[in-house]
Amino acid sequence: HSFPTRRSADLALDHGAVPMTARVPRCVVDLNRGPDEIDPLVVSGVAPAALNPRIMAGLGVIPRVVSQGRAIYDRPISLAVAQQRIERLWHPYHRALAALIDEAVARFGGAILIDMHSMPRDALAHLPRPRPDFVLGDRNGGSASTRITSEIASAVQAEGFRLRRNSPFSGAYIATTYGRPRQNVHVVQLELDRSLYMNERMVEPRVDFGAFALRLERILKRLAGLRPDACDSSIAAE
């Protein structure tokens, strides 16, 4: 997903990682949801069946709310519009992502996907202080090996950032779907507090953006050096 600076994506590429950036605003279609996670309060003509907590919270594949529970729509959209978004935006992204993973497995015997997101500061408002700067999610050990998760955590903490694991975000559709550590495919979700690099109210970079970008680049350099290991004995029980 989106990096705070293009230099960070370029650096990852320089060190052998392949950056893949989502260009679709999450309020249009959420790529970290399943294509069937459709909210009947947003999309007309959908039966209210099999509602999971994400859909009930208004955070399905077509989100109903943004931060602080603010409504996106004043009326439901049609099922045809929702299906068009999913077909034109969701499916191409996931086809490309699956192809990259398959290519890595074919060439190197395994793959590591670091699914990076930024989160609004208020997403952590309910947590006790000091609040984390990053939240690492590996589905509580289900989407990545302990070794790889620990190395990612170490890279973040080495730059002085506070990190929390699997709470309040343990990973969603991407980690659940693509994380197969026993097949040497590891997925870790990294949520970073966007107030670290931008003024959220003014929607502009902070004055110390450059210093943050350098810290993030050092993290990405370490992450780009990670290697999957088919003999890794630290894979958590699924």
Residue map of PLM features:
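His/Asp/Glu-rich mid-to-C-terminal helical/loop segments that flank catalytic regions of hydrolases
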Residues: E200-E238
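Short, His- and charge-rich active-site/binding loops that engage polyanionic ligands
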Residues: V29-R75
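C-terminal helix-cap and adjacent tail motif
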Residues: L51-V65, N140, A144-I148, I152-Q157, ...
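Short, glycine/charge-rich beta-strand/loop segments that flank catalytic centers
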Residues: V18-G34
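Short, small-residue-biased leader/transition segments that mark boundaries at the very start
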Residues: H1-S8
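A structural motif corresponding to the C-terminal end of an alpha-helix
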Residues: A9-V18, A104-R107, A158-G160, I219-L226
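Catalytic cores of processing enzymes, dominated by hydrolases/peptidases
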Residues: P92-M198
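Internal, conserved structured core segments that host functional sites
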Residues: A57-D102, F108-G109, H117-P120
